[in-house]
């Protein structure tokens, strides 16, 4: 839960500042490098401003992706793995889709993958 919270907090903060999409794991060029300019060179002494907080995603290790003003992340809800679509700027849940049962193992429960956005389609596989 903490991992998802801090990951979303980080991406929500970053994507509030930049305009580019990050439509899949490791970004648009599959290399983990943002081509955006004008980014902060250091965090403010009080840390980054929290843009929004989501407590409805549950557990998991999914990396969020951002495309077209929407943030997609996988988590758990009602005993199932879910794909959550949220407004990137405000965090409002737009929709959810059930992916299947929750993966339970010795390495931590919940989904591990990241969704991929291609045009107007979103692809996601559960853990």
Where do the PLM segments sit?
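Noncatalytic, solvent-exposed loop/strand surfaces
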Residues: 19-127
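Sec-dependent N-terminal signal peptides
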Residues: 4-13
């Amino acid at each position: 839960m903490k991992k998802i919270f801090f990951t979303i907090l980080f991406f929500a903060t970053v994507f509030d500042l930049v305009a580019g999409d990050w439509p899949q794991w490791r970004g648009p060029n599959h290399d983990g490098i943002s081509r955006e300019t004008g980014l902060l060179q250091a965090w403010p002494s009080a840390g980054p401003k929290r843009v929004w907080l989501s407590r409805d995603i549950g557990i998991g290790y999914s990396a969020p992706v951002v495309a077209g003003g929407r943030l997609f992340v996988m988590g758990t809800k009602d005993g199932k793995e879910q794909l959550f679509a949220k407004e990137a700027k405000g965090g409002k849940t737009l929709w959810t889709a059930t992916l299947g049962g929750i993966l339970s193992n010795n390495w931590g429960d919940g989904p591990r993958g990241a969704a991929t956005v291609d045009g107007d389609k979103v692809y996601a596989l559960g853990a």
